[in-house]
């Protein structure tokens, strides 16, 4: 554990004491995630990318002032994804705020081989069709067979890749040029993969994977 991080929350203390060893365990506690360092520790391979930068000017008594609004996506490319927005008078602080917020919004998604055209049983696509919306933007994500790739818009490609989705078809409607709403719609669609309840009595034709399948052990000392 880094000396630079002193846990301040119950969840942080459980991680620091070794009682929680994976991000999956942390999220399942339902305890609020208020320390981004928890994500850094349990997902040391997490990546981040800026997907939108907006600058706005407003008049004040002292003249024109510039405000940055920046959107960042984080993920481990293996079942975990987060999205955050940060605002500040300068770009660097806005990026840092967005990065922290993205980590605090980290979530576990489900993957599988939900395409009837494939049936390989691997965690390369969505397990079933999901939909998400934000503002006027609505997006539908459908499972695709291996080799199709990500047949979606550029922003959606980044988010899906960060989440560990390799193949998918997507259909969007609304003001999709509004990047923030488009990104949030994709994020909300992925959130639906974890919300759908699966009857344990039903025999699935293909496995559904929650979270990481490449490295499920989290941080190792």
Curated annotation (Swiss-Prot):
Domain remark in the UniProt entry: The N-terminal domain interacts with the head of the 30S subunit; the C-terminal domain interacts with the body and contacts protein S4. The interaction surface between S4 and S5 is involved in control of translational fidelity.
Function according to Swiss-Prot or TrEMBL: With S4 and S12 plays an important role in translational accuracy.
One matching Pfam family: Ribosomal_S5
Keyword Ribosomal protein attributed: yes
Protein name per its UniProtKB record: Small ribosomal subunit protein uS5
A GO BP annotation: translation
Keywords for this protein: Ribonucleoprotein, Ribosomal protein, RNA-binding, rRNA-binding
InterPro entries: Ribosomal_Su5_D2-typ_SF (IPR020568), Ribosomal_uS5 (IPR000851), Ribosomal_uS5_arc (IPR047866), Ribosomal_uS5_C (IPR005324), Ribosomal_uS5_euk/arc (IPR005711), Ribosomal_uS5_N (IPR013810), Ribosomal_uS5_N_CS (IPR018192), Ribsml_uS5_D2-typ_fold_subgr (IPR014721)
Subunit structure: Part of the 30S ribosomal subunit. Contacts protein S4.
GO molecular function: rRNA binding; structural constituent of ribosome
Entry's Gene Ontology cellular component terms: cytosolic small ribosomal subunit
Gene for this chain: rps5
């Amino acid at each position: 554990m880094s000396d630079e991080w002193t846990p301040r929350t119950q969840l942080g203390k459980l991680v620091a004491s070794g009682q929680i060893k994976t991000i999956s365990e942390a999220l399942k506690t339902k305890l609020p995630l208020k320390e981004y360092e928890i994500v850094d520790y349990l997902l040391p391979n997490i990546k981040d990318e800026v997907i939108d930068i907006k600058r706005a000017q407003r008049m004040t008594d002292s003249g024109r002032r510039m405000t940055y609004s920046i959107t960042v996506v984080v993920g481990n490319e293996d079942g975990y994804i987060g999205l955050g927005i940060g605002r500040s008078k300068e770009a660097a602080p806005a990026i840092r705020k967005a990065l922290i917020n993205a980590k605090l919004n980290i979530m576990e998604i489900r993957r599988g081989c939900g395409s009837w055209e494939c049936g390989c049983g691997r965690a390369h696509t969505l397990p079933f069709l999901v939909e998400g919306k934000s503002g006027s933007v609505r997006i539908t994500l459908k499972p695709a067979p291996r080799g199709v790739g990500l047949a979606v818009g550029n922003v959606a490609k980044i988010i899906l890749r960060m989440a560990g989705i390799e193949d998918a078809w997507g259909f969007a409607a609304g003001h999709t040029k509004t990047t923030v709403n488009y990104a949030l719609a994709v994020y909300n669609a992925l959130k639906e993969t974890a919300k759908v309840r699966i009857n344990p009595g039903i025999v699935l034709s293909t496995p559904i994977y929650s979270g990481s399948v490449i490295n499920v052990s989290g941080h190792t000392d």
